[in-house]
Amino acid sequence: EEIRYSMSVFKDKILLITGGTGSFGNAVLRRFLRSDIKEIRIFSRDEKKQDDMRHHLQAQYPEVASKVKFYIGNVREKQSVDIAMRGVDYVFSAAALKQVPSCEFFPMEATMTNVVGTNNVLLSAIEHGVKNVVVLSTDKAAYPINAMGISKALMEKVAIAKGRELGSGAATTICCTRYGNVMCSRGSVIPLWVEQMEQGKPITITDP
């Protein structure tokens, strides 16, 4: 009863998931497919991942696959975000560069996606009257020691500043949520360990 009640707020609503082909997007999509939600929009850069997701939905969830619409774009480009944002009620802002080594080698790329890109999503959501935006952060944003964590911490500051700027009673509510390592997600340690064991290699463990 509690689960059905909690999902009732999404009845006949439109949900946008930026970075929707990632680990989070896939999990959320499965959760919402069986609800009374009107439409789920998947926004991402990778047409191959979108095509794979589309075929998977048609094969596994044929009766509800039509609820899912796909938008190719980049959060760094607000114009493409605006197109996907039209008519949206709720947003999960999950588009990010999250691989720690990649962010270390290319910190400006991490900043452009995680900070500027998220700001574009927030601006677009506010302009289009979206009810709620949930910005996905990470536990690495607490006392950050690497570029990924720093970019996510700054992203949180941007979201908090936007919420403060809107003030209480605004049409759009912005919130951030932090979560830790997700088991078997892309870039997580478990797939690496499995691969190393299958190849008979030593398991690598780091000490911060």
Model-inferred region functions:
Residues 18, 85-94, 135:
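Rossmann-fold scaffold of SDR-type NAD(P)-dependent oxidoreductases
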